[in-house]
Amino acid sequence: MEEIQRYLQPDRSQQHNFLYPLIFQEYIYALAHDHGLNRNRSILLENPGYDNKFSFLIVKRLITRMYQQNHFLISTNDSNKNSFLGCNKSLYSQMISEGFAFIAEIPFSLRLMSSLSSFEGKNIFKSHNLRSIHSTFPFLEDNFSHLNYVLDILIPYPVHLEILVQTLRYWVKDASSLHLLRFFLHEYWNLNSLITSKKPGYSFSKKNQRFFFFLYNSYVYECESTFVFLRNQSSHLRSTSFGALLERIYFYGKIERLVEVFAKDFQVTLWLFKDPFMHYVRYQGKSIMASKGTFLLMNKWKFYLVNFWQCHFSLCFHTGRIHINQLSNHSRDFMGYLSSVRLNPSMVRSQMLENSFLINNAIKKFDILVPIIPLIGSLAKENFCTVLGHPISKPVWSDLSDSDIIDRFGRICRNLFHYYSGSSKKKTLYRIKYILRLSCARTLARKHKSTVRTFLKRSGSELLEEFLTSEEQVLSLTFPRASSSLWGVYRSRIWYLDIFCINDLANYQ
């Protein structure tokens, strides 16, 4: 990044207009593939591949071809004869698209660093902690228990590839880079395969994750920009958390066009959505907006979002993709947890002089539970148990060593306990732990052609120790016997700031 900054340093006023020449720099592809330039072994000797291998020699040959021939003229007559679109088009497109994604991130990274540098010394937030998935749940615990209604929103998909190009045009003003992006999108992938989870686009996103996530996040940021705008316009105290979000050109013109749908007076429209208790969270292609306001206010927000996305993105957005739910009467599947706001009744006895009376008090509490049925379904899909939750052996792992089998089962159990540590009721987790432990024992018994009882007698406590989580290991040393303190810790919620992704159960790398 320092070398890129030196490249863009001579003319800061036009630094966003010179991204295209970086495509022909070799170190860009090294950075995109997380290769260091000063390693002991030569990268040039690596074999080219489609998954995780990379070769500078292939990139140099590709760049030479791009200089010698004009491969970017799309023609229906000679597309079959074009060597660039031949047998190696998947490898070439993968390398260039990942390099392009790294280059296109430069304007965003420079602006983000300059914005975060202004917060140094103020201790407003730590960005590396906010990367964790668990960082969202303390925010929900602190705020959602005081709110009434929530909007469950499915983020709309762009109906045309040109929308993705136009979205980046506000940030990257390099016409050559945008033409290259347009070439990738129109030549190799169509809309349905790029954004949705159909097979062609799904394989593309698996191989070009950086490129895919960059395009999708740019589009989602464009969808969310209206919340930043309205929040800053309707609030006298600007929120410092929006300091890293920068507005784009022509946005005010689009807002004024949208205002014509609601009212002639823009200030009246802003007054309708002035809500200091509005909270917004996005996750997994969905988003939720919670408010302390009434059902009428949430209904206004719903139709505002529908009209905004229809006018701004020229797409047909159905109102059925936004649902209004009352927090106290609705449970939702949120990031693998089952979250809800419950009313916990409590009885308070009050004594005044000689008279005593009881006061019924209901307190709202944000409750987070572990969904047992989806977890058992995931374990059944990976052949750890039946659909009813009965443990079975896993014959695919019978060829592995005993230590590898125990380590794989133990890693899955520890990962599940680590992620679902925020649940206050861990009875479900101990049932999952029982399924995995017995499935491990049956797999080992199947390998050694013995019964489960015989194997457990021979292994003793070694198998049990492998399934202990980090919290249980500490508790077993601190509290050698069961006590009230031990069970109190078991019931407590623990949120970790080192969980950045949710891996599949079958991913053991």
Curated annotation (Swiss-Prot):
Transmembrane segments: none annotated. The keyword Cytoplasm does not apply. One of its GO terms (biological process) is mRNA processing. One of its GO terms (cellular component) is chloroplast. Signal peptide: none annotated. InterPro entries: Domain_X, Maturase_MatK, Maturase_MatK_N. Usually encoded in the trnK tRNA gene intron. Probably assists in splicing its own and other chloroplast group II introns. This is Maturase K. It comes from Anthocercis angustifolia. The lineage of its organism: Eukaryota, Viridiplantae, Streptophyta, Embryophyta, Tracheophyta. The gene is matK.
